[in-house]
Amino acid sequence: MSRYTGPSWRVSRRLGVSLSGTVKELARRAYAPGDHGRDRRGKLSEYGTQLREKQKLRFMYGMTERQFSNLFVRAGKIKEGTHGANFMALLERRLDNMVYRLGLATTRRQARQLVNHGHITVDGKRVDIPSYEVKVGQIIAVRDKSKNLDIIKNAVEAVVSRPSYVDFDADKLEGKLNRIPAREDMNADIDEALIVEFYNK
């Protein structure tokens, strides 16, 4: 299954969650798109509830189904912690997400584009793979020739707060993951237990 590249607001309204993180797409119409979206949400089956939770998280991180399910399998091989919490931590450590968490982009989609276009380095080396797994202590920075991009400067200026598991130097436009993200650090609107149940059927 390919990555969805259409309007994020349509998916946000269908799933009832802000994919951009700005919640603007839900501010006016917090129901599914279409003329009868307001009336279409009936009671979901157990499977439907699990599927929707999985889709919410997958679209939130902008991943294909194959990427998402492969990462889920990897999380299950980690011996410490729960499967769901480990999965969430691996998602958070994706390079595109870390660029977003550091405040170098206003959305994950924008962060993914910055990585794809070669504007980001890890420990001084350019990395253009959004799924790159960031390790604790690695330095994520904007390339020197990209530091004057308005898209980056505007994003940094708009930051209100950053997660406690990242450090950021605004002067150098660089930061790092200072520890593995704990479950309580992450999105409370996601019930990862439903996703574990979905894949374990």
Curated annotation (Swiss-Prot):
SUPFAM superfamilies: Alpha-L RNA-binding motif. Keywords: Ribonucleoprotein, Ribosomal protein, RNA-binding, rRNA-binding. Residues 93-156 form the S4 RNA-binding domain. The keyword Isomerase does not apply. Gene3D superfamilies: Ribosomal Protein S4 Delta 41, Chain A, domain 1, RNA-binding S4 domain. GO terms for molecular function: rRNA binding; structural constituent of ribosome. It comes from the Bacteria. Transmembrane segments: none annotated. GO terms for biological process: ribosomal small subunit biogenesis; translation. The keyword Ribonucleoprotein applies. InterPro entries: Ribosomal_uS4, Ribosomal_uS4_bac-type, Ribosomal_uS4_CS, Ribosomal_uS4_N, S4_RNA-bd, S4_RNA-bd_sf. One of its GO terms (cellular component) is small ribosomal subunit. PANTHER family: 30S 40S RIBOSOMAL PROTEIN, SMALL RIBOSOMAL SUBUNIT PROTEIN US4M. Part of the 30S ribosomal subunit. Contacts protein S5. The interaction surface between S4 and S5 is involved in control of translational fidelity. One of the primary rRNA binding proteins, it binds directly to 16S rRNA where it nucleates assembly of the body of the 30S subunit. Belongs to the universal ribosomal protein uS4 family. This is Small ribosomal subunit protein uS4. It comes from Limosilactobacillus reuteri subsp. reuteri (strain JCM 1112) (Lactobacillus reuteri).
